[in-house]
């Protein structure tokens, strides 16, 4: 399997596994030499046996540490916690924040309409208009504005929450208010 050259983290992890595999091979060779030396009638010097034993201990510690690190990484990936290369949590937090922002815009618009029923259009600042132009670029990939943005800006009821709430509830509220205004005119 050829590693993806565009992902250096993955390449490093695969290289670490290959190095660990080579360490396991060397460890097996050391163990084989120790067992062969012990099986001989005439044993080799004590220094050679100690060198092989120390080399084996060093290699087994390296392999254990590397395999533990790899297993810990895989356990993080499996349970979905944050790990190298994961953007799921960040994306989820961003979407949650956008949802909360649109909900706040909608509630604020309703409060403004409740407090000042004569004002059909909320007061927009230069900053809100700039935010709305950013929403246009995000909503339409080809640069064309979405239908909710177009309808809200043409009838004058849009304002700073272009994509924050649908146009259906606004039109129902406006039609309800117009009916009460018409009823008042008829009574007079």
Curated annotation (Swiss-Prot):
Compositionally biased intervals (Basic and acidic residues): 171-180
One CC-aspect GO term: mediator complex
InterPro entries with a match to the protein in the record: Mediator_Med11
Span list, region Disordered: 116-188
Biased composition annotated in UniProt, kind: Acidic residues: 123-141
Biased composition (Low complexity): 146-155
Source domain of life: Eukaryota
Gene3D superfamilies per the UniProt record, alphabetical: 1.10.287.3490
Compartment annotation: Nucleus
Gene Ontology molecular-function annotations: transcription coregulator activity
Coiled-coil intervals: 46-72
Oligomer and partners: Component of the Mediator complex.
Name this protein carries in UniProt: Mediator of RNA polymerase II transcription subunit 11
Species, as recorded: Caenorhabditis elegans
